[in-house]
Amino acid sequence: MHINSVVRNYRFLIGALTALMLLLLLRSSASPQVGSLANSNKVDTPDGLKVPGASSPISQNINEDSQKQTAKDHTSQNLESGSNSLSKSQCTEGHKYVVMIDAGSTGSRVHVYEFDVCTQPPTLINETFEMLKPGLSSFDIDAVGAAKSLDPLLKIAMDAVPKDKRNCTPVAVKATAGLRMLGDEKSSKILAQVRKHLEQDYPFPVVDGDGVSIMDGEEEGVYAWVTANYLLGNIGAGSKLPTAAVFDLGGGSTQIVFEPSFPPNEKMVDGEHKYELSFGGHDYTLYQFSHLGYGLMQGRNKINTELVNVAISSGTITKGQTARTYELSSPCLPPGTTAEGEKVKISDDEIYTVNFKGPKVPAGPQCRYLADKILNKDAKCNTPPCSFNGIHQPSLVHTFKETSDLYVFSYFYDRTQPLGLPLSFTLQELQDLARTVCNGEEVWESVFSGIEGSLSELSKEPQWCLDLNFQVSLLHTGYDIPLQRELRTAKTIANNELGWCLGASLPLLESANWSCKVSKVE
């Protein structure tokens, strides 16, 4: 009897253990699995161009380094599982490189991108960046000199791309507003010489067609939007997320691009400002516009033109007599400062040389008035609402969420970071900074003494008062951004340079418009 009881207990124990093991096995098999990423991240541009989409988002830490930026291994871990990742034994291409040269109005920049193409979509592994001055447009009629000015940048590209990859690494040169304003004849000669120099003296295959060209302002803005939102992880990440608006301020033009949202019974008005984009399996309807002639350097010239025209009206300057140098007071300079030898271009054949000097007392509000004036807010608005110059723009207040980011970069960054503004600030803080700078040296010491390098920056560049007032006018008066709205700025995100170049480089991973060079030029 005792033995039978032991046997029954033993059988019960074995049964319980077996049931427990089965339960654990069932729970294990029901555990959620890592899902595969979308297979077809593509950008559809209006002219049918298929652009490989971005990889899984790079981490969102913002690193502000020196002008030379190198990003290492930020995204490779994101695509190692799921159907999007090709096995290394199946993939024979390995890494691909793209060389993109940004020929801007004030300088040229090279970006060398390295992608792991054994993932779908390709993974951005590395970026090498460097810039130099002056820009191609400064060479005017010296087309050969303009082409050779790119040699230091191309040497950096040669060093960044392995020797055995160079003959299959496409290169493109995209010029922006500065070259556009030289006129068709001069700019065409410069671009032709640049293409010739690349084809004859470097091993990189030059992209056919518009590989060496002046980029359309529409493309410039949209590619900048793609770059910023890709690096922020807002696009190409699977699910559709809110996107950031971008405001890019160059030397010759400025771009605005954002994704407005409308009530169900409304939609964006059709027109050249409307840009339909497909990226990472999601559709985006963007508002974009490139305001040619409203980059920082052109803004300076417009404000100084107002002062020269007043001087012509009063007889201080004799119209048409451009051989001499004139002396004028400017409210856009701090007291006690001068800006000598400034070239004020009224027209192609009417360029005055002026020594500007600051007033006896600060005149920042008068400078702001001039900055507002050149925006032509009173221009006829055929399709309301409008930003400036009669250009239609959906209201950022009513169609863009307050919780979504507004990113301002390029000259916005260059004029705020040396003076101590953080990477996130309100438009009111930018306006206060402009007022402080315009007040002059008497207040600079107490405000900027603790910010390394700021006093020397202000001393060597007297135009910061003008520049900051122009930026405040552009954002507040022009784009109607409230003073309390928070702005974000950056030069890089995860060590990758902001701007249009990354977005424009993605199509070049496909060789539809270029082919490897058979004979290498080393």
UniProtKB/Swiss-Prot annotation:
Pfam families in alphabetical order: GDA1_CD39
EC number: 3.6.1.42
Catalytic residues in the record: 220
Principal subcellular localisation of the protein: Golgi
Pathway(s) of this molecule: Protein modification; protein glycosylation
UniProt catalytic activity: GDP + H2O = GMP + phosphate + H(+)
All ranges on the Cytoplasmic side of the membrane: 1-6
Location in the cell: Golgi apparatus membrane
Region (Disordered): 35-89
GO cellular component: Golgi membrane
Highest taxon, organism lineage: Eukaryota
Keyword DNA repair on entry: no
Biased composition (Basic and acidic residues): 65-75
GO molecular function list: GDP phosphatase activity; ribonucleoside triphosphate phosphatase activity; UDP phosphatase activity
One GO biological process term: nucleoside diphosphate catabolic process
Transmembrane segments: 7-26
Topology term for the membrane: Single-pass type II membrane protein
Class of this enzyme: hydrolase
Keywords annotated in UniProt: Golgi apparatus, Hydrolase, Membrane, Signal-anchor, Transmembrane, Transmembrane helix
Lumenal-facing ranges: 27-522
S-adenosyl-L-methionine keyword on record: no
Biased composition (Polar residues): 76-89
Function recorded in the entry: After transfer of sugars to endogenous macromolecular acceptors, the enzyme converts nucleoside diphosphates to nucleoside monophosphates which in turn exit the Golgi lumen in a coupled antiporter reaction, allowing entry of additional nucleotide sugar from the cytosol.
Family: Belongs to the GDA1/CD39 NTPase family.
Protein name as annotated: Guanosine-diphosphatase
Species classification: Eukaryota, Fungi, Dikarya, Ascomycota, Saccharomycotina
